[in-house]
Amino acid sequence: MTDADSGMDIDALERVAVYQFGSAAGSALFGGSELDVTRSTSGRPRQVLAPDGRIGTYSTTGRFTLGLAGGRRLHESLPHPDYRVVVGDESEPFVRDGKNVFAKFVQEVDPDVRPGDEVAVVHHEGDLLAVGRAELPASDMLDFQTGMAVAVRDGATDN
């Protein structure tokens, strides 16, 4: 892979991030650091890695699944509550350990979150706890007392 090919990959992947997460996401995820794009055997971009960890995986669906480093970058740059699910003290240690988020523990959520969206799970004090996939729409996360709200992929055990 040449440097020009890598730059083209980053530009294309940045456009996907803008489509998926909004206009500020492209520069948040892909700006300011040296990135490595791994490829599948067919040559398709697969993993986007940075010195601080995995930004995300570019799936066959044409969307990103967030890694913890990507969730941290979005959390630091997107306005609150975009792509966030906020939980309290009761579930914080479990979510940080990589356990799923249940609806009864959700205190706040971006009203535009839909099932299948990638989200950052944050503590009400602002710490990133995990990243994962929303399983319920935002309104149901707040209304339901049972059910899984977010399938956690990576917990922030290092914080």
Spans of features found by a protein language model:
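Solvent-exposed alpha-helices and their adjacent loops that cap or buttress functional pockets
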Residues: 39-41, 111-114
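N-terminal intrinsically disordered, low-complexity, charge/repeat-rich segments that act as generic
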Residues: 1-60
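Generic short beta-strand
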Residues: 46, 119-120
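Beta-strand/loop-dominated core regions that host nucleotide or nucleotide-derived cofactor-binding catalytic loops
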Residues: 62-107, 113-115, 121-159
